[in-house]
Amino acid sequence: MRVGLYPGTFDPVTNGHLDIIGRAVKLVDKLVIGVAINIGKGPLFSLEERVEILERETAHLKKIAEIEVRPFDSLLMHFARDVNAQMIVRGLRAVADFEYEFQMTAMNQQLDREIETVFLMADPRHQAIASRLVKEIATLGGDIGKFVPPGVAQQLLAKVGKG
């Protein structure tokens, strides 16, 4: 069984994340979406909310491949081994992403050479989307409808007191 791991904080999940997930499920038999606890980033959504949102927003993809949404707070490569992943899936939006991901991949290869990293280029419609910016736009009362699914927009606007 080909198992891929798509890790992230997903605070909130965006249309860009969902595009990568929708393409990644076509490459594997099972995709584990690893939700990083990452308290250092001070997430707006709780871990439970992020897991629930991802389960809801990816439910329609389960007919393509098995999908499992799991939180993790360990080293990524340890988590990848725990879920028997042969590959880590990462999305690239811009050159800055590539530089960071290149460095992370080099370090991860030192930790486990058996686990490959696969990069998927962001769809041009989603290249500018970043969770941090979506939260900022929502907080300032802007329209986030192009950046996140309707259910996520509703939850985010409620969180920032605009819904």
Swiss-Prot record:
Which N-terminal residues, if any, form the signal peptide?
A: none
Pathway this chain belongs to? Cofactor biosynthesis; coenzyme A biosynthesis; CoA from (R)-pantothenate: step 4/5
Query: Recorded E.C. number(s)?
Result: 2.7.7.3
Chain residues that bind substrate: T9, K41, L76, R90
Please give one Pfam family short name. Answer: CTP_transf_like
Q: Catalyses which reaction?
A: (R)-4'-phosphopantetheine + ATP + H(+) = 3'-dephospho-CoA + diphosphate
Keywords (A to Z) from UniProt: ATP-binding, Coenzyme A biosynthesis, Cytoplasm, Magnesium, Nucleotide-binding, Nucleotidyltransferase, Transferase
**What InterPro entries does this protein's entry cite?**
Cyt_trans-like, PPAT, Rossmann-like_a/b/a_fold
- Record: residues binding ATP: T9, F10, H17, G91, L92, R93, E101, H126, Q127, A128, I129, A130, S131, R132
Q: Which cofactor does it need?
A: Mg(2+)
Q: Spell out the subcellular localization from the entry.
A: Cytoplasm
The record's annotation in PANTHER family points to:
PHOSPHOPANTETHEINE ADENYLYLTRANSFERASE
| Cross-referenced HAMAP family | PPAT_bact
Can you state the subunit structure given in the record?
Answer: Homohexamer.
**The protein's role, per its UniProt record:** Reversibly transfers an adenylyl group from ATP to 4'-phosphopantetheine, yielding dephospho-CoA (dPCoA) and pyrophosphate.
What name does this protein carry? Phosphopantetheine adenylyltransferase
- What would be the name of the gene that encodes this protein? coaD
